[in-house]
UniProtKB/Swiss-Prot annotation:
Gene (name only): trpF
Name of the protein: N-(5'-phosphoribosyl)anthranilate isomerase
Family stated for the protein in its record: Belongs to the TrpF family.
EC number(s) per entry: 5.3.1.24
Coiled-coil stretches noted in the UniProt entry, renumbered to this chain: none
Gene3D superfamilies, sorted: Aldolase class I
Length: 223
């Protein structure tokens, strides 16, 4: 089953909408973004979430002490590192880690093997001067069969109900990550979310899912 993460949750109304749609992995952005959220607001939402919900914090070049403080305060399950964090940044962090890689060309994937302490890779579009959340797609052929050392691939970057099916059939990711693609006028939209999930379901019917590492189980992230 292809997992789905909906990122950029800003309030309880959006969180409840996502949960009601059947998605159990929510992303909270603690970096400069139109969808950024304060730790206090994120914690308030997270304390209301039902069991078996996975929370992912998105960070961009956050100082380690600050990242650990926010992760502990908000009780985050997974940390998504979406900046230029080097492999050694990951050492000693207790939460499960996802390292985002911005894909410009085939050479963009050369650094994957250095990140031995992460549990998965999120592949996003490379846009000059932007860490992520651009709503821009990239050439999925570049990451088809990417050598990740057996670690799960989470596909992001401009995914929408209209294109996610094709992306899944080509890349066969462990999970897909969406934010702006399920929004209308900058807010999460139930009809767009439902259409996205239906497109994922239909795409799954056309291929057999590979077995994924249990380290990221629960991930159901563009911010």
């Amino acid at each position: 089953m292809v997992r789905v993460k909906i990122c950029g949750i800003r309030d309880w109304e959006e969180a409840r909408m996502v949960l009601d749609a059947g998605v159990d992995t929510l992303g909270f952005v603690f970096a400069r973004s139109p969808r950024a959220i304060k730790p206090e607001a994120a914690r308030e939402i997270i304390t209301k979430l039902p069991p078996f919900t996975t929370t992912v914090g998105v960070f961009v070049n956050e100082p380690r002490y600050s990242l650990m403080e926010i992760a502990s305060f908000c009780r985050l399950d997974v940390l998504q590192l979406h900046g230029d964090e080097p492999p050694e940044y990951c050492h000693g962090l207790s939460q499960r880690l996802i390292k985002a890689i911005r894909v410009r060309d085939a050479a963009s994937l050369a650094s994957l093997e250095a990140y031995r302490e992460v549990q998965g890779f999120l592949l996003d579009a490379w846009v000059p001067g932007k860490a992520g959340g651009t709503g821009t797609t990239f050439n999925w052929e570049l990451v088809r069969g990417a050598a990740t050392g057996g670690k799960p691939v989470i596909l992001a970057g401009g995914l929408t109900p209209e294109n996610v099916g094709a992306a899944i059939q080509l890349v066969h990711p462990y999970a897909v990550d969406v934010s702006s693609g399920v929004e209308v006028d900058g807010r999460k939209n139930p009809a767009r979310i439902a259409a996205f999930l239906e497109a994922v379901r239909k795409a799954e019917e056309h291929h057999v899912r590979p077995t994924a590492s249990s380290c990221c189980t629960g991930l159901k992230g563009d911010f």
